[in-house]
């Protein structure tokens, strides 16, 4: 009888306090969280392990469904971005560069990515791929992963190819709504909806994002998936037949877990809402709130101690209270 192989997990970043240990592998993105000193795994952290930073305030794409709306604001200042990283870098493992527009079009995009890596924080971002420049691809090699939003346009497929040609871990972000229901379920069933325009063998994953009737999307509530569509999607996404990996945002996961029970292995990688527990969002004008979809009334000005806002402000405590009562729910009703 052959002896069992011992599996050794390698991590290059560690945070530990009296309550928990947080381990991270910056190459694979694997994160391990566990209670210490006889304590259970924590419900929430002392700071976010994933921080969504809205570096962009401007966007010329004007997508009809944009949850950010079409109001144009100044982009985040590099000095503000650096001050955030200075505060959180010991605890925060990943930052998602986002906001109202393509992060790679920020004038200091390269400096932001480099500053993250200098402080052992892994940057990731999503882009439309429009007017993607060679130097943006080069700096993207320092990111953990890049996602391209699927607009089904030539610039979408061109961006995907160029990222993959550069050896960058590349994902597709696909909105799941009433209109894209057939496309999403087809992709999961292994049907090449892109008709060869995407190199499926090199694609890392397709991440399905639940449509949010927020911002400009408030006028498009007809895109909200029906209960039947959600139930079918929930069954398909846990039994994929495609070559690439499949993922979903926590907003969609909340609904999936209402209809399906994941396997033990799936349960380890499916997260319900993490807002105010494991993640938070900072706007281009330095307002800290539990998630990027939260209304303005839940914003907290980032003019004090970030840790104090995270742990003591009413918006963050409200989110945690709701999620503690029911994990697979949305505190703002999505």
Feature names for model-found ranges:
Residues 6-17, 25, 30-136:
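Conserved alpha-helical substructure of the radical SAM core
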Residues 1-9, 13-15, 205-290, 333:
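A C-terminal junction/extension of Radical SAM enzymes
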Residues 59, 63-66, 273, 291, ...:
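Short cysteine clusters
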Residues 23-24, 281:
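Hydrophobic beta-strand positions
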Residues 1-19, 27-30, 285-334:
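Flexible mid-to-C-terminal extensions adjoining Fe-S/redox cofactors in radical SAM and related proteins
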Residues 60, 131, 153, 177-179, ...:
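Short, solvent-exposed loop/turn segments at secondary-structure junctions
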Residues 78-210:
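Radical SAM/AdoMet-radical enzyme domain recognition
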């Amino acid at each position: 009888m052959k002896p069992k192989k011992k599996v050794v997990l390698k991590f290059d970043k560690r945070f530990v306090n009296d309550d928990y240990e947080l381990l991270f592998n910056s190459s694979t993105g694997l994160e391990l969280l566990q209670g210490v000193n006889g304590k259970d795994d924590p419900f929430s952290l002392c700071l976010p392990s994933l921080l969504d930073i809205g570096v962009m305030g401007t966007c010329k794409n004007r997508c009809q469904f944009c949850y950010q709306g079409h109001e144009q604001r100044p982009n985040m200042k590099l000095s503000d971005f650096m001050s955030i990283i200075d505060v959180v870098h010991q605890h925060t493992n990943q930052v998602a560069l986002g906001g109202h527009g393509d992060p790679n079009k920020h004038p200091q995009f390269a400096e932001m990515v480099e500053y993250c890596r200098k402080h052992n924080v892994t940057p990731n971002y999503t882009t439309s791929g429009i007017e993607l420049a060679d130097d943006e691809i080069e700096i993207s090699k320092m990111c953990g992963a890049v996602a391209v939003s699927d607009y089904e346009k030539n610039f979408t497929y061109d961006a995907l190819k160029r990222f993959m040609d550069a050896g960058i871990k590349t994902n597709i972000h696909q909105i799941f709504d009433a209109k894209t229901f057939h496309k999403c379920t087809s992709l999961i069933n292994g049907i090449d909806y892109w008709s060869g325009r995407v190199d499926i063998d090199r694609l890392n994953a397709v991440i399905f994002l639940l449509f949010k009737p927020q911002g400009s999307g408030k006028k498009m509530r007809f895109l909200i998936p029906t209960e039947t569509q959600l139930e079918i999607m929930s069954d398909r996404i846990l039994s994929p037949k495609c070559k690439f990996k499949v993922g979903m945002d926590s907003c969609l996961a909340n609904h999936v877990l209402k209809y399906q029970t994941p396997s033990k292995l799936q349960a380890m990688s499916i997260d319900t809402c993490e807002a105010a527990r494991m993640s938070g969002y900072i706007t281009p004008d330095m307002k800290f709130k539990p998630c990027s979809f939260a209304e303005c009334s839940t914003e907290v000005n980032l003019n004090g101690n970030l840790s104090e806002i995270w742990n003591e402000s009413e918006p963050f405590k409200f989110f945690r209270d709701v999620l503690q009562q029911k994990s697979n729910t949305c505190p703002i009703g999505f």
